[in-house]
């Protein structure tokens, strides 16, 4: 649990992860927490059961399930104009970084949609791919 993040109702979707502190561009915000799951079949089975996807793939056979033992970062919503991004870091971990300066009270967002597999997006960003 971070003292710099909180979870509350989001205007994008359900609940969101919000900054309680100022984050400067490229600063690490937090680690994405959860249970490390190994085995693509096991991961796929979890994906089918989850209403809101909280699984982040590390490689083709390993993922982190933020629905089990996760923290506030499991509630980061998608935006076509994100303010943060994820990077895999050593030790089967995923870190969240600020893409630009983020103010306290601002919702953290990441572009986690696959451009090769378009789907309807309702993120509300001015440059949302569904508006094109």
Predicted segments, located by residue:
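Catalytic cores of histone-lysine modification enzymes
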Residues: 1-86
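C-terminal SET catalytic tail plus cysteine-rich post-SET Zn-binding segment of SAM-dependent SET-domain
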Residues: 18, 52, 80-132
């Amino acid at each position: 649990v971070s003292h710099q993040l909180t979870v509350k109702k989001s205007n994008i979707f359900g609940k969101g992860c919000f900054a309680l502190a100022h984050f400067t561009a490229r600063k690490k915000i937090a680690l994405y927490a959860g249970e490390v799951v190994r085995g693509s079949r096991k991961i796929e089975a979890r994906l089918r059961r989850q209403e809101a996807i909280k699984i982040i793939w590390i490689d083709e056979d390993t993922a982190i399930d933020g629905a089990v033992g996760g923290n506030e970062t499991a509630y980061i919503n998608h935006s076509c104009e994100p303010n943060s991004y994820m990077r895999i870091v050593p030790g089967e971990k995923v870190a969240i970084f600020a893409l630009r300066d983020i103010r306290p009270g601002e919702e953290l967002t990441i572009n986690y949609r696959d451009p090769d597999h378009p789907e309807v997006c309702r993120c509300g960003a001015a440059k949302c791919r569904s508006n094109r």
